[in-house]
Design a protein with these regions (language model features):
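Amphipathic alpha-helical interface segments
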Residues: 1-101, 116, 121-160
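Long, charged low-complexity segments
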Residues: 103-114
Length: 160
């Protein structure tokens, strides 16, 4: 099973050239990512008892969902020019460092593993203390870029 991400609309490195439909789809996916992050934050605040049980990260499906959506945005930014260089450079290192984990999370959602040991566990992904802040910076940067483009287009439409 494979997934396809249609990122061909933004070819010159800017959301500015994305069609209205493309921007609407990006905003929809951003909303899903934001909702998944909020759900994960609630689950994280409630805590969990970590032990060696592979099911110990059972409540954190929202984390995998959030990461899978960030993965799509990250690949679109790095490989297909979704963000302008000005928007990408501040998060490039965070994005490049996060992408392997994001891809592993996406894979977990689209391919059912043969055993529980084959998937990345939330506790392992967060243990270093850097992963979660890095993901939040990436998340915030994509959200800000999309909001700015959306507002810019709304203002442009009022000027007509």
């Amino acid at each position: 099973m494979s997934t396809q991400v249609d990122v061909g609309a933004a070819v010159n490195g800017s959301l500015r050239d994305a069609s209205f439909d493309r921007l609407a789809c990006l905003l929809r996916h951003w909303t899903w990512a934001d909702e998944a992050m909020a759900t994960f934050d609630r689950e994280l605040a409630n805590g969990w008892d970590y032990d060696d049980d592979p099911m110990s990260d059972h409540p954190f499906g929202a984390f995998y969902h959030w990461c899978a959506l960030l993965c799509a945005f990250g690949e679109a930014a790095l490989e297909h020019g979704l963000l302008s260089p000005f928007q990408l450079e501040p998060i490039r290192q965070d994005l490049e460092a996060s992408l392997p984990g994001l891809r592993a999370c996406r894979q977990l959602l689209v391919v059912i593993p043969a055993s529980l040991e084959e998937h990345p566990r939330v506790v392992d992904l967060l243990r270093d203390g850097e992963t979660l802040p890095r993901l939040r910076r990436v998340h915030q940067a994509f959200g800000e870029a999309l909001r700015k483009e959306h507002v810019s287009r709304e203002i442009d439409s009022l000027d007509r």
